[in-house]
A protein has these predicted regions:
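Conserved PLP-anchoring active-site segment centered on the Schiff-base-forming lysine
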Residues: 116-138
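Conserved core segment of the aminotransferase class I/II
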Residues: 230, 234-302, 309, 313-314, ...
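Active-site phosphate-binding strand-loop segment of PLP-dependent enzymes
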Residues: 146, 150-221
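Conserved glycine-rich beta-strand-loop-beta hairpin in the small C-terminal domain of fold type I
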Residues: 287, 303-312, 322-334, 366
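N-terminal small-domain helix-loop-helix segment of the aminotransferase-like
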Residues: 2-105, 112, 290-292, 394
Length: 394
């Protein structure tokens, strides 16, 4: 047999090393030893999808027409449901035919949108720390990522004055990625902040891509805004959303993009050439979810708030600095100065059998922080709290 050299493309070489490979290796070693691990590392809801959504899926799956190729843009029924939900939840009016696009999960849309608007060598502003897909999608499109720091002193909001200095000598900046409520920092943003974003984007002629996947996971009666609520936002931007976190449907892969119709159309052109749309039965079930989101979402928030109020004091008791978040199901905990994130996480796995995520996995500015999730039952989090209270590291 001829030996072939299967050399991957240069774009793959540009992707950062997979930090979590070492953590996964340690996890597997512990499991092979017979040790049980408590995982607070992955933001994947442990709660079940609501029954009324599953019932709609079952009915939809029995319709033979739903097993044919779906529309590239998505079912109009689902897009109308998205528009109604945005009107009801945020007071934002959308045209379901031109301002709503169905996605195979919001991650797919985020991963593809640079292909629609970024030419090789052009720049994209990505938050640091931030969801790694923003950075990876830019590189895979041949773009140049410009990380901008999210610092605790600024409540993990960007400093637009500093960003302006960063981009003075850069190639054309095409996209600004934002994400509030934020993963991994759990920070929230106000409508006043989004007004500032609109002003900055219009000044520099930049497309704003806001990731709003955690808008419905909020606490203490503090609903989170949509970027599109800001005056003029739809002129320069779009918003990614998903049913994954809101309805415990991460495996179903249904999301949506809303906003400026030219931005929507650009991503739709990419999708037309790359995928064949989301399964219609899943879109029907997602329609049911959006049409009957309450009281399900209220109860979901109650559960996560109970979990938050168990875990945060336990983290603080170990010597970690950790604010109680207004939204998301993440705790973003700061280690003492000079203590590496990876070292802490590996030690936590080996000695306490608890899995968390090192902050530097989300970017350079994440070093010195650790992310924990609330995606475990209250009884498990109470067990974690007891373990942590007996183990004061600092």
């Amino acid at each position: 047999m001829t030996n072939l050299l299967f050399e991957v493309s240069q774009r793959l070489h540009k992707l950062p090393p997979y930090l979590f490979a070492k953590i996964d290796k340690i996890k597997q070693e512990e499991i092979q030893k017979g040790n049980s691990l408590i995982s607070l590392g992955i933001g994947d809801p442990d709660l079940p999808t609501p029954d009324f959504v599953i019932d709609r899926l079952v009915r939809a799956a029995k319709n033979p027409q739903n097993h044919q190729y779906p529309s590239y843009w998505g079912m109009l029924e689902f897009r109308k449901a998205v528009a109604r939900w945005y009107q009801s939840r945020f007071g934002v009016k959308l045209n379901p035919e031109s301002e709503v696009l169905t996605l195979i999960g919001s991650k797919e849309g985020i991963g593809h949108i640079p292909l629609a608007f970024v030419n090789p060598g052009e720049s994209v502003l990505v938050p640091d720390p931030g969801y790694p897909v923003y950075h990876a999608a830019t590189l895979l499109a041949g773009g140049h990522p410009i990380p901008f720091a999210l610092k605790e002193k600024n409540k993990f909001l960007p400093d637009f004055g500093e960003i302006e200095r960063q981009i003075q000598s850069s190639t054309k900046v095409k996209i600004l990625f934002l994400n509030y409520p934020n993963n991994p920092t759990s920070a929230s943003a106000s409508l006043e902040f989004f007004k500032e974003v609109v002003s900055f984007a219009k000044k520099h002629q930049i497309i704003v891509c806001h990731d709003n996947a955690y808008s419905e996971i909020f606490y203490d009666h503090c609903p989170q805004p949509s970027f599109l609520q800001a005056p003029g936002a739809i002129d320069i931007g779009c918003e990614f959303h998903s049913i994954s976190k809101t309805f415990n449907m991460t495996g179903w892969r249904v999301g949506f993009l809303v906003g400026n119709p030219k931005i929507i159309d650009g991503l739709a052109q990419v999708k037309t050439n790359i995928d064949s749309g989301a399964f219609n039965a899943c879109q029907e079930a997602a329609t049911e979810a959006l049409n009957h989101s309450e009281p399900f979402c209220s109860n979901l928030r109650r559960i996560y708030q109970e979990r938050r109020d168990i875990l945060i004091p336990a983290l603080q008791a170990t010597g970690l600095k950790c604010q109680k978040p207004e939204a998301t199901f993440y705790a973003w905990a700061r280690l003492p100065e000079g203590y590496p994130s990876e070292n802490y996480v590996l030690d936590l796995i080996r000695n306490q059998k608890i899995v968390a995520t090192p902050g530097n996995g989300f970017g350079q500015e994440g070093e010195g922080y650790v992310r924990f999730t609330f995606c475990s039952e209250a009884s498990v989090l109470k067990q974690v709290a007891e373990i942590l209270r007996k183990t004061r590291y600092f």
